Amino acid sequence: MTMTRLPMAIDCRHLTFHYGQFTAVDDLTLEVRPGETMGLLGPNGAGKTTLVRMLTTLTPVQHGELRIFGLDSRRRTVDIRSNIGYVPQQLSIEPALTGRQNVEWFARLYGVPRAERADRVAQALQAMQLLDVADRLAGTYSGGMVRRLEVAQALVNRPSLLVLDEPTVGLDPIARDGVWTQVQSMQAQFGMTVLLTTHYMEEADALCDRVALMHRGVLRAVGTPTELKSKVSPGATLEDVFRHYASSDLRGEEPESPEVSQSEFREIRTSRKVASRAS
């Protein structure tokens, strides 16, 4: 009997992206399996944010091929977006709204049916252990609570792929552990695939099934943390691996696209102003 091969959660083939003369992503090929946690590592300016924006269809693919659960990113953008939860680096909460209202706004954006909306919002808040404070203004939340609220926003449409771009940056170790405890619980419950970018090497080592390390837009290494550490030296840490692949020929912290980041920030703020008026 012939076995049907399930599509990869993420399937990148020769992705290349240019900002003018600057190559942000250079002929990148990568597969992420359904249900795994993949860490995307690299120094500032390595191309991680540009790659994440392509994976979430916020930036169209220029060259190469990208499929998310078998869907072509050029032809099935709407279907892909409905299947992805995304927590960007920039804060995406509206402080003047309650935690519940913030998640409700995302439920509307994702097209969650009105009849299901209240239950789905409550479930997302409960998953991040925020239901007890759901009716407090988000502006009164701690840093860790804000990040958990953003994950709740991303979970309200029950995505198959959760993309977390520096989700615990600036948080203390206890708050970081709190975020990851809840994310891992949801992943175990629903079998989500998780793509994580982080500069915390110990976090990537502990949480990721595999890691992919980028430098100068090029994918330099892919493997389990144990595999990559063993290739560098006996007793190496993941930070040693990072330095091994990324410390030579650094080009400085060149921004991947300041205009794109500012535009995204303006879009987020505009959406939140609309949400505030609507509520």
Language-model features: where?
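ABC ATPase "signature
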Residues: V222-G223
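Helical segment within the ABC ATPase nucleotide-binding domain
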Residues: D177-F190
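Conserved ABC ATPase "signature" region
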Residues: E104, R108, A115-V133
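Catalytic Walker B motif of ABC-type/P-loop ATPase nucleotide-binding domains
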Residues: L162-D165
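Conserved ABC ATPase signature
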Residues: L137-Y141
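Conserved catalytic motifs of ABC-family nucleotide-binding domains
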Residues: R158
